[in-house]
Amino acid sequence: MKLGIVGLPNVGKSTLFNSLTKAGAESANYPFCTIDPNVGVVPVPDERLDVLAKMHNSAKVVPAVIEFVDIAGLVKGASKGEGLGNQFLSNIREVDAIVHVVRCFEDTNIVHVDGNIDPLRDIETINLELLFSDLEILERRHAKLVKSVKGDKSLTKELDLVERLQKFLEDGSLAKNFEVVDEEEEKLLASFNLLTYKPTIYAANVSEDDLADDGASNEQVAKVREYAKKEGSEVFVICAQIEQEIAELDDEEKKMFILY
């Protein structure tokens, strides 16, 4: 599985990536610190695999892996090429699911591209750029279908789906919330590889002080949770900076931070 870590500049994407992969990707207090996507592959521990290996005397044990892609910060106008946006959007299109990092902490030492902390505005900014990119994909598909359907009536169903999808996205809705009429439409929709159709989980990046109650006292986290619930997505609370510091410890030191 390949997961893409996305968000605005300076929200903690590369810091989270480093905590997950120990890759040491650059993270700094300025926009577009990441330009080319950083990629890290993390094995998924599974005790059952060890048991099976012993039972069958396996010479080699290959665990499942998750590939994380740290994608450079998106900005308003990314779908039109702002901030190297087209390149970044194409990187997102290659992943299976999206981890959307949203900043829910105050820190005057870390600049925010819009000047203040507002995670819902940040989410809307990213989602709009994904929507615009999807609409461009659908427009090109629609133009091709209009020409092809004249000689192949079997494409009528796909053309109808594309037109309904275009209207749905133009109204500001995400493709993942589109209701298909049958299994064939579901397969067609998946084949379009739309960004807003990909499963999304929101990573609410908080300060260390907010970890004790899992962000329950943080108003910004509450807003993200409410938004995600309406969208049908999940939220997890993390202090990416602390997680990165823990990831850099040796194995013995890490044990005191692990919850069983």
Language model features with spans:
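Helical mechanochemical/support elements of P-loop NTPase systems and associated helical scaffolds
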Residues: 31, 35, 48, 61-67, ...
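C-terminal-of-GTPase-core extension/linker across diverse P-loop GTPases
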Residues: 2-6, 11, 17, 146-260
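Conserved Switch II/interswitch segment of TRAFAC-class P-loop GTPases
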Residues: 40-45, 72-82, 93-155, 168-182, ...
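Conserved G1/Walker A P-loop phosphate-binding module
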Residues: 1-111, 139
